[in-house]
Curated annotation (Swiss-Prot):
Its main location: membrane. This is Protein translocase subunit SecF. GO terms for biological process: intracellular protein transmembrane transport; protein targeting; protein transport by the Sec complex. Part of the Sec protein translocase complex. Interacts with the SecYEG preprotein conducting channel. SecDF uses the proton motive force (PMF) to complete protein translocation after the ATP-dependent function of SecA. The lineage of its organism: Bacteria, Pseudomonadati, Pseudomonadota, Alphaproteobacteria, Rhodobacterales.
Amino acid sequence: MAFRLKLVPEKTNFDFFRWQWATFGAAIVMMIASVILPLVIGLNFGIDFKGGTTIRTESTTAIDVGVYRAALEPLELGDVIISEVRDPSFREDQHVAMIRIQMQEDGQGAEGQGAQGQELVNKVETALTAVDPALKITSFESVGPKVSGELVWTAVWSLLAATVVIMFYIWVRFEWQFALGAVVALVHDVLLTVGLFAVLQLKFDLTTVAALLTITGYSINDTVVVFDRLRENLIKYKTMPLRDVMNLSVNETLSRTVMTGMTTLLALVPMLIWGGDVIRGFVFAMVWGVFTGTYSSVYVAKNIVLFIGLDRNKEKKDPSDKFFSNGAQDGAP
């Protein structure tokens, strides 16, 4: 006998429009707040966006990240990230670590020029050899403010490019009203994540940008499922009011939406608890993104489409249907 876990019944009849203005209004308010908060409070940019120095160390003894971190704390270097590098090509007694240190206030340290850059490396080497005499610094490099500024703009353009591509896909797959609803939902998810990072002053670096891109993919996947069912129901229930068709479509896909979110959280929560500092920012953003993505799929995207309206009297067979037909039209009454 097969065991099936059901968090939500297959057939539900919730009225997702009952508190329409409250749920949609809350989303708009949070989006506006998420734009203002980073400007007022500021984001806690990581080394990728502030600039800093990366030091590569090598030792014949096993690496203890906690011991390394404790040894560097008296130096008061600010943001320090220590990670062990593993590679099958390494010898059995070859242990490599990467140490990333934020740009110091007393000097740029860019490209390791001058006494200041070398002084930083010497301080780190002295502190670490005290706890691991076999340790050697094999290389180091620095990222200056100019390069880190370019990384910020690259991150922004990558998010904008992803949004444009997704909007084009939804436009071709469905209609422009659906594309606009999906993009507003994506912007909602990204802005709320950035706003939360500003409020909590969590480290915002390239891994966070990767999480934002992943959130957009997760969110659009949820939204497309709802929109696809909505399109099928619009053909099936031609005389039903648009609001009722939308509510029916959300109810019919609710079980899938909840199960997808729960299974994703089952993988993310253990990583958030035991994954360590290196990936904690990425995982935290993803956990938050699961909730915002689910909320936007249910309460944001459909409200945009409802507000704009759909022309249900036009001919259903668009050119796009030739490429993306799922057979729903053939079996529709």
